């Protein structure tokens, strides 16, 4: 491919809002162009990379026995009303109406569409299991799109959905997809981990995320030093904590006057105790489809509430901070709230680690008063949930110590169970002729996001450094002086010989200064470069490895063989 025939609008400057290297370099090197908030066009270079990512994903999915389909990007709202997600999904769901006033939406995901495709057509256990997938557009109206392709509103995703006659067979497919995803991300040359995760708006259980480890990652990942355990901070678990400090002694629950002690710090100072033996109350406003209410979450005084866990505990769509006025209106006492003696109309949850704890200190539900000698017993089991945020240094369940690293999510697999099939009436007849809902799995990969992730994982201060598997071209030939007939002819012959061997070549035949051409080579990041210049008079060319910019002189007679050997 001649550079003069390729649309590559490279620039020296990056957009002001481009803070991450991947965002800066993909725009500067002409891989993508922004047309709106969170909206990007893929240009020829970007499309070449995107196609290679798609082909790797498609190859491994096909090998795993999945069938590729293409579902409509515009979805009737009625399908989402059947699953009860039409209003539950929130503002990220872009809803619209046609000229007949019918409800439609731009698909952020396709569970409803795939169920509609299969129900009434797959009717017997003999037709199961079935796995359908697609690679196509999605739209989520992100409140704050940022970081280029890493968090945009329109994106390309591989989403697969499997249907099963039993939970055991769903688990088998889930494990197969974990293996398949491992193969995909390994072929892309990424340093990644499969981590335990929260299911989010998709729902279901048995959720795992695939995280590429990167210092600029948005997600915190907890990793054990004793095993392969890894989890997103929203789903991380730990061993029950212990405290060596002396526990406050009290034969019975007593109420103490604690004026001005409305924080854990002041309470621990007042009673001269470790915060481990205190209980913190966190009050949130839980928002539901058609209502909202104040919910209280109780954790140890030295713990923090993990909001995703809390949101799942009370089955809310989302949580927001409750104002002091809202807290008081609900009959609560800010700064002095405790689990014992709460008004019966208050919804509350207690962290699992507090169950059966004795001689604790907490608010007495009366201004300026705390209770000591509080025993967390005789509460309904349903009140206890995993609420505390796991931190670096906590003990893992495997006995190791947990540390925190950063990651970028590139894939997510779920065991949905019967959530969608039950609500949408998708059933089959089992071997006994009994009607049952499908067990479903859901498997996603952020295909367009992977383009940015690969740059984030492999770049230097000058530009992209593409791995061979997904590079837009394999060899970049730079002709120092296109007016030199000998240089141009050698470059054209090298291009022809490489292309006839199946090697993708970019030949820079522009009438530009050599410095401009070299800067573009470094910016675009093709794995291997060949500079054809004055050295050709001595039968030499310069060979460059983009990773490290190592340059060596190579005989012009040997360069073709060297390139074929390393490629």
UniProtKB/Swiss-Prot annotation:
Catalytic activity entry: tRNA(Pro) + L-proline + ATP = L-prolyl-tRNA(Pro) + AMP + diphosphate
Keywords: Aminoacyl-tRNA synthetase, ATP-binding, Cytoplasm, Ligase, Nucleotide-binding, Protein biosynthesis
Molecular-function GO terms, alphabetical: aminoacyl-tRNA deacylase activity; ATP binding; proline-tRNA ligase activity
An annotated GO cellular component: cytosol
Enzyme Commission number(s): 6.1.1.15
Localization in the cell: Cytoplasm
Entry comment, domain topic: Consists of three domains: the N-terminal catalytic domain, the editing domain and the C-terminal anticodon-binding domain.
Function text: Catalyzes the attachment of proline to tRNA(Pro) in a two-step reaction: proline is first activated by ATP to form Pro-AMP and then transferred to the acceptor end of tRNA(Pro). As ProRS can inadvertently accommodate and process non-cognate amino acids such as alanine and cysteine, to avoid such errors it has two additional distinct editing activities against alanine. One activity is designated as 'pretransfer' editing and involves the tRNA(Pro)-independent hydrolysis of activated Ala-AMP.
Name recorded for this polypeptide: Proline--tRNA ligase
Organism: Campylobacter fetus subsp. fetus (strain 82-40)
Annotated gene: proS
């Amino acid at each position: 491919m001649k550079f003069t025939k390729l649309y590559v609008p490279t620039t020296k400057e990056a957009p002001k809002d481009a803070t991450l290297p991947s965002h800066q370099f993909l725009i500067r090197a002409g891989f993508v162009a922004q047309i709106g908030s969170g909206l990007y066009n893929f240009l020829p270079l970007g499309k070449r990379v995107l196609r290679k990512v798609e082909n790797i994903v498609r190859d491994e999915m096909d090998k795993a026995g999945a069938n590729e389909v293409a579902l409509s990007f515009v979805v009737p709202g009625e399908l989402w009303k059947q699953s009860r997600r039409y209003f539950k999904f929130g503002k990220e769901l872009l809803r619209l109406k046609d000229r007949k006033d019918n409800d439609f939406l731009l698909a952020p995901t396709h569970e409803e569409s795939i169920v509609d495709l299969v129900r009434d057509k797959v009717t017997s256990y003999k037709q199961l299991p079935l796995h359908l997938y697609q690679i196509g557009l999605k739209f989520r109206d992100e409140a704050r799109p940022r970081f280029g392709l890493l968090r945009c509103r329109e994106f390309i995703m591989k989403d697969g959905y499997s249907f099963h006659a039993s939970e055991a067979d769903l688990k088998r497919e889930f494990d197969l997809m974990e293996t398949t995803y491992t193969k995909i991300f390994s072929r892309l040359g990424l340093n990644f981990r499969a981590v335990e995760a929260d299911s989010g708006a998709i729902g279901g259980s048995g959720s795992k995320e695939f995280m590429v480890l990167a210092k600029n990652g948005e997600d915190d990942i907890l990793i054990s030093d004793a095993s392969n355990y890894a989890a997103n901070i929203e789903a991380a678990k730990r061993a029950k904590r212990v405290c060596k400090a002396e526990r406050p002694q009290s034969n019975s629950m007593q109420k103490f006057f604690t004026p001005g002690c409305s924080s854990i710090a002041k309470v621990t100072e007042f009673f001269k105790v470790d915060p481990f033996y205190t209980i913190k109350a966190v009050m949130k406003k839980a928002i539901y489809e058609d209502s909202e209410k104040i919910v209280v979450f109780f954790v140890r005084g030295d713990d923090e509430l993990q909001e995703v866990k809390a949101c799942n505990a009370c089955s809310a769509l989302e949580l927001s901070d409750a104002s002091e006025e809202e807290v008081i209106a609900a009959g609560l006492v800010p700064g002095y709230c405790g689990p014992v003696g709460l008004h019966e109309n208050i919804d509350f949850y207690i962290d699992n680690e507090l169950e059966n704890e004795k001689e604790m200190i907490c608010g007495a539900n009366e201004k300026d008063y705390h209770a000591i000698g509080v025993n967390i017993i005789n509460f309904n089991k349903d009140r206890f949930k995993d609420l505390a945020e796991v931190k670096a240094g906590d003990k893992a369940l495997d006995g190791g110590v947990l540390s925190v690293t950063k990651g970028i999510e590139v894939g997510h697999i779920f065991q949905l169970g019967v959530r969608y099939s039950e609500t949408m009436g998708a059933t089959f007849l089992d071997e006994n002729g009994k009607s049952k809902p499908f067990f479903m799995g859901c498997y996603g990969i952020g295909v367009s996001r992977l383009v940015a992730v690969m740059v984030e994982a492999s770049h230097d201060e000058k530009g992209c450094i593409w791995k061979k598997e997904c590079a837009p071209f394999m060899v970049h030939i730079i002709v120092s002086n296109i007016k030199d007939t000998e240089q141009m002819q050698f470059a054209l012959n090298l291009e022809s010989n490489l292309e006839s061997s199946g090697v993708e070549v970019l030949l820079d035949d522009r009438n530009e200064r050599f410095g401009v051409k070299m800067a573009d080579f470094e910016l675009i990041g093709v794995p291997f470069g060949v500079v054809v210049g004055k050295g050709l008079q001595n039968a030499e060319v310069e060979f460059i490895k983009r990773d490290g910019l190592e340059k060596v002189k190579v005989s012009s007679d040997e360069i073709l063989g060297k390139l074929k050997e390393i490629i």
